[in-house]
Amino acid sequence: MFMRTVNYSEARQNLAEVLESAVTGGPVTITRRGHKSAVIISAEEFERYQTARMDDEFAAIMAVHGNELRELADK
């Protein structure tokens, strides 16, 4: 996937086009003073990210406390 990069001034001046690019073409990196500052992604992509993050957090909790939780559930 190609990630477009624009500087802050360009992003601000062309916000609608940058947002459309994030929705239809993939993530857009915003730079400030030559350094990566932020990434704009579509709402759909953000939801997938959030779901994956919650799945990872749940797996980590279960790895640490899974046995205790199963024992409590069996009581």
From Swiss-Prot:
The keyword Methyltransferase does not apply. GO terms for biological process: regulation of DNA-templated transcription. It comes from Salmonella typhimurium (strain LT2 / SGSC1412 / ATCC 700720). Coiled coil: none annotated. One of its GO terms (molecular function) is DNA-binding transcription factor activity. NCBIfam families: phd_fam. Keywords: Toxin-antitoxin system. This is Orphan antitoxin YefM. Signal peptide: none annotated. Belongs to the phD/YefM antitoxin family. InterPro entries: Antitoxin_Phd/YefM, phD/YefM_antitoxin, YefM-like_sf. Pfam families: PhdYeFM_antitox. Gene3D superfamilies: YefM-like domain. GO terms for cellular component: protein-DNA complex. The lineage of its organism: Bacteria, Pseudomonadati, Pseudomonadota, Gammaproteobacteria, Enterobacterales. Putative antitoxin component of a toxin-antitoxin (TA) system; its cognate toxin is unknown.
